[in-house]
């Protein structure tokens, strides 16, 4: 996002986000309403600096692997996470954190004026959280966003108690919408949807260690809801292209243009343990990887915006054979 804002050629009409992406979304909205793109960039950096400060005190995992001078650093980081992960399988957050302490709660109140944010009219925000009782996704819009909504969107159930909002309890939105794409179809005018991936879609190697298996399972789980929505998009596009829909209904369907900023190569060396790391050196490394990836995407695909999809959803995400022509049955 920082690279897109620096570029200045892209106007962001809506952001659908979940989990850590929700922090980016609210920081963007808060900063943009006060100072435009540069204000948004400043707000993003300020918020993540506060996340880093909070993590220095409370993060269960340290990024030892950044110390390249010690060969065993990565192994120690994995061991630390493994011990912590085992702990969460024995005790729930209702047991080891009965007071429901979350360092993000106070940090959010210090960084963002939510009474002002709910009046943001420079971007449509869509924040996803998973309803624990129903298993359905709930999407919160600008006027509904509070610190509790942000905490719900990023609530990993192994770490934190479910967040109660309006009598319902919520976990991380990534389980059912990572992110949710449908609000962008229904509530925005733009045909272009740019998906920014933080989990690799594909990995060439078969995981064989316990840590690698857990890492890949985490990636597959959090990519599943997105892939289902992309399958639905591909189906509608196929119906439009093969003229299975009557002319009087075709105009009612938005022929969306899909773009994808994928960082499979840039992030392939980062496992699930790094999702709990928040020191500033590591966060700026992530930012720089993202900026480099976004810069390449802009150079290669900017001219596609407003004209055509820069990827073929069927070949980029779906299994081979899913793009076979539809056949009528009688």
Which residue ranges define each predicted feature?
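Active-site gating loop/helix substructures
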Residues: 85-191, 195-196, 202-215
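Short active-site oxyanion
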Residues: 11-14, 168, 256
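Hydrophobic/aromatic beta-strand patches that form the interior of the parallel beta-sheet core
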Residues: 16, 128, 194-196, 257-261
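Patatin-like phospholipase
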Residues: 1-102, 108, 142-152, 208, ...
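Acidic, Ser/Thr-rich peripheral helices and adjacent loops at domain boundaries
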Residues: 207-238
């Amino acid at each position: 996002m920082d690279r897109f804002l620096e570029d200045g050629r892209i106007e962001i009409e809506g952001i659908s986000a979940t989990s850590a992406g929700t922090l980016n979304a609210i920081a963007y909205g808060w900063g943009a309403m006060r100072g435009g793109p540069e204000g948004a960039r400043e707000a993003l950096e300020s918020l993540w600096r506060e996340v880093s400060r909070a993590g220095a005190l409370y993060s269960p995992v340290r990024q030892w692997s950044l110390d390249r001078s010690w060969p065993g650093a990565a192994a120690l980081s994995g061991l630390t996470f493994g011990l912590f992960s085992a702990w969460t399988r024995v005790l729930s957050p209702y047991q080891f954190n009965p007071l429901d302490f979350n360092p993000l709660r106070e940090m959010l109140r210090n960084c963002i004026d939510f009474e002002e944010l709910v009046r943001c009219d420079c971007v449509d925000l869509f924040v996803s959280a998973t309803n624990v009782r129903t298993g359905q996704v709930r999407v919160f819009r600008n006027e509904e966003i509070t610190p509790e909504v942000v905490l719900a969107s990023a609530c990993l159930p192994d770490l934190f108690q479910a967040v109660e909002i309006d009598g319902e309890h919520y976990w991380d939105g990534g389980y059912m919408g990572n992110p949710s794409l449908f609000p962008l179809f229904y509530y925005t005018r733009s045909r272009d949807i740019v998906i920014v991936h933080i989990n690799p879609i594909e990995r060439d190697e078969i995981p064989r260690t316990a840590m690698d298996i857990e890492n890949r399972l985490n990636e597959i789980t959090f990519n599943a809801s997105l892939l289902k929505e992309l399958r639905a998009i591909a189906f509608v596009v196929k119906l439009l292209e093969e003229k299975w829909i009557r002319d009087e209904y075709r105009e009612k369907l938005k022929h969306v243009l899909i773009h994808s900023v994928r960082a499979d190569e840039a992030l392939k060396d980062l496992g699930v343990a790094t999702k709990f790391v928040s020191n500033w050196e590591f966060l700026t490394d992530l930012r720089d990887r993202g900026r480099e990836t976004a810069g390449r995407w802009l150079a290669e695909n900017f001219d596609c915006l407003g004209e055509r999809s820069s990827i073929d959803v069927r070949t980029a995400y779906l299994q081979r054979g899913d793009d076979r022509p539809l056949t009528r049955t009688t």
